[in-house]
Curated annotation (Swiss-Prot):
Native species: Pseudomonas entomophila (strain L48)
Family that this chain belongs to: Belongs to the class-II aminoacyl-tRNA synthetase family. Type 1 subfamily.
Pfam families per the UniProt record, alphabetical: GAD, tRNA-synt_2, tRNA_anti-codon
Site (Important for tRNA non-discrimination): H31, G82
Binding site for ATP: R220, D221, E222, Q229, E483, G535, L536, D537, R538
The protein, known as: Aspartate--tRNA(Asp/Asn) ligase
Subcellular location(s) of the protein: Cytoplasm
InterPro entries the UniProt entry points to: Aa-tRNA-synt_II, aa-tRNA-synth_II, aa-tRNA-synth_II/BPL/LPL, Asp-tRNA-ligase_1, Asp-tRNA-ligase_1_N, Asp/Asn-tRNA-synth_IIb, AspRS_core, GAD-like_sf
Keyword Transmembrane helix: no
Keywords tagged on the record: Aminoacyl-tRNA synthetase, ATP-binding, Cytoplasm, Ligase, Nucleotide-binding, Protein biosynthesis
List of residues binding L-aspartate: E174, R220, H450, R490
NCBIfam families per the UniProt record, alphabetical: aspS_bact, PRK00476.1
Amino acid sequence: MMRSHYCGQLNESLDGQEVTLCGWVHRRRDHGGVIFLDIRDREGMAQVVFDPDRAETFAAADRVRSEYVVQITGKVRKRPEGAVNTNMASGAIEILGYQLNVLNEAETPPFPLNEYSDVGEETRLRYRFIDLRRPEMADKLRLRSRITSSIRRFLDENGFLDVETPILTRATPEGARDYLVPSRTHAGSFFALPQSPQLFKQLLMVAGFDRYYQIAKCFRDEDLRADRQPEFTQIDIETSFLDESEIMGLTESMIRKLFKEVLDLEFGEFPHMTFEEAMRRYGSDKPDLRNPLELVDVADQLKDVDFKVFAGPANDPKCRVTALRLPGGASMPRSKIDEYTKFVGIYGAKGLAYIKVNERAKGVEGLQSPIVKNIPEANLNNILDRVGAVDGDIVFFGADKFKVVSEALGALRIRLGHDFELLTCEWAPMWVVDFPMFEENEDGSFTALHHPFTAPKCTPEELEANPATALSRAYDMVLNGTELGGGSIRIHRKEMQQAVFRLLGIEAAEQEEKFGFLLDALKFGAPPHGGLAFGLDRLVMLMTGAQSIREVIAFPKTQSAACVMTQAPGLVDAKALRELHIRLREQTKVE
């Protein structure tokens, strides 16, 4: 072997021993005729000292530069008093180098590895192989590996089988656009890359495998955000003969064990909250419980006021009027209020009403707001009592369609929590349950809130009679306002699956064309089953404190779904297109 130890393995117990290291020159220093090289490998860093007494080795050390790949042999010794570096795991020792072999030279990197804060993300992605040398980046990928190992170990110990499902499959309606792959052997036909292994894992339950898992690559051709990539990794789990409480208990144990093993954090039992309560109190189906701010409905106090902005929504069952109190916010300048007004506009809000509570004892005179003149004093007091307002607070209001108010004030709640440093703890895991089966569109049609294979909490007849009020057997695990994973009990009876398809506007012929294999499987003794899928990239992002999932993926795509390093996607030659029976149309030039 070319090395005897990794740099990160060196410590005082090796004092006096000979070691051989392989790695990159992180930094070179020349102090008073002695050369110091900081050598870096994937496990850490070590300081190597070269004395001029060994002329040949000293000369070789004098020639090396940053990022040269080297092999060094030397003797471990304790550092002199006062020279210990507490920032390095091996900081109590150094190596007296007496043999140096340059394995490869290196040009000057496009950016220094220890000064990366001003380097643009595109440059970092173009030279990702350099960027990944930084200890901060290597640490994230190393932690990712520990996370997947812990999860695999837990699932293996609990009787789950790791089964691979196809990557080349057919398009199914799962909400986002599919990545399509043309078939050379079936002219005019296309495979689709899977958005999830959903149907295959259900078929594995029909086949009797009982407990399945897979760390699966999934693909979605959608607009990208900070927590989205066109290809992402999913921890996919499915079980038979367990109900939702048992599946939630099992996967909660897995996450608790993971955080204990990897971060040495003890989580208690995760609280449960219904979808309806989460939307009402937090304006989100993935609330961040670290934030103490809450939305409070006040429509009943504003139905009869002579102020249409409030009275209209207050009397409309499809709308809501909500208050959000910010403790100590009365000193907020108008410019900041305008900034927050612009912010909620992103979510469709037409404005942001507010009341500053300067001195409640003075009644209306102690309140500062353009809206107080339109609301009777008794109603104002009821509202302020309900939200718990005291002197020095500011209360914001939203009045509009339920979805607009929930999203706008829910987002404002999160923004205020961060801007005013209100978070009360570092971690807040929870479960959200009792989701609606469907979302009703403007035209009265329905869309599956999760996916079309989620089981409802009712019979097919009850579902078709009252689809708008039907609840599903779905559950989401949420951590710090981020959905870690979502799952449900699945439909295992053909009649129920057909009823759901009908409500989604998928008629019998289309059902047979797109889902005939699933409907067939449900006829042949499908067991009760359910599961859950975790987003691995998001989980690693939270556990490492990264700002984006691009920071925890070795070779991510940009926000335009491109790889600047390999220049993918790229053009292909005409011969390959002909073999695939594809002809490119000329793009119309816009003058």
